Amino acid sequence: VHRPGELTAADRAAWSALQRARPPAEAPQLHNPFLAPEFTLAMGACRRDVRIAVVREDGVPAAFFPHQRTPAGVGRAVGLGVSDCQGLVHGPGFTGDAVELLRGAGLALWEFDHLAADQPVFADGAGARFGSPVMDVADGWESYLAGLRERSPKFTRTTLAKERRLDRDLGPLRYVHDERDPELLRVLMAWKSAQYRRTGRGDRFAKPWITRLVEHLFHTGPGEVRGLLSVLYAGERPVAAHFGLRSAAVLACWFPAYDPAYAKYSPGLVLHLAMARGAAEDGMTLLDLGRGRKEYKDSLKTRELTVTEGWVTRRHPVAFGHRMRRAPVRALRNTVQGRPELFRPADALLKRMGQFRTGG
């Protein structure tokens, strides 16, 4: 078990090689940047509780198990709460035992909420299953757009009409796929924090480690795995922006936001279409929109991957106590989110509370 800074260059190269062992078309989640060593190393630069268990066969790395841990041995997926793809990174044919893995890592339990598919080691702990919508651009932008027109004709017409109107009223429009100005990152975080407050959600950027993580990933590069800030400008003013994490094949969509002064133009949707085009032109195959019930995701997606939520445990009192505390909260949240007749009023209540707090 290593701290992130203790991994050798050879270990990091072996980790990346395991991710590339199968092509994106066969194992798209394996290429997700949240499973890359760069993300875990960035987490380690921002938090002290990050560890990596390395499974070796005949002295050669066969699997990497990044996680966070408490002194009592409660383990969590690295970045739990902000990472959209989690799991053990291993090559084809790897077999292992979850209990032995936990014992070797000194953990009583390991909790996850976005476990990737094809994780046989943790299959017994996988509970609730969720769709993770993706935009498939492997065949290019034009192919994606043609499919979007067929799947969501009204959405496509409306969004493209708003794009033309935005260009006419405030333009010309300009899209920067890889914006390197750190001031624009601060603008995005301010927009996102305001959105969290406006909709009654907890502000993720109120947690200093998340802000440090995003800034660290923004300044990482050049390289295949790094933060990617994309900005849509109308004239000289930014109207929408997105910060995500990219690998050679996958853009993990993470923090989208827009200037609410221009909400009538749906600049966030216009931005997502521009991102799809930019990703396709950059050689990527997928934009992973992440788990969660959102109408815009249903409109933009070509299909869904599967992620699961749950935990694997050893027979240990710490594991029992943690599950007793966490299970009721998780079950209630999933029940509300999974039933529209409960989710809609709960969502409306959060938004009213947000408006009250912000004076809206």
Predicted feature residues:
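Short glycine-enriched loop/turn motifs at secondary-structure junctions
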Residues: 46, 80-84
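Short loop segments at secondary-structure junctions
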Residues: 58-59, 92-93, 136-141, 235, ...
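Non-catalytic accessory segments adjacent to catalytic cores
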Residues: 94-139
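A conserved beta-strand-loop-helix scaffold within acyl/acetyltransferase catalytic domains
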Residues: 1-58, 62-75, 115-132, 146-264, ...
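A short, structural micro-pattern
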Residues: 82, 106, 126-129, 169, ...
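Active-site/acyl-donor-binding loops of N-acyltransferases
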Residues: 120-150, 248, 284-345, 349-354, ...
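Aromatic (often tryptophan-rich) hydrophobic motifs at membrane interfaces
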Residues: 73, 83, 96-104, 204-322
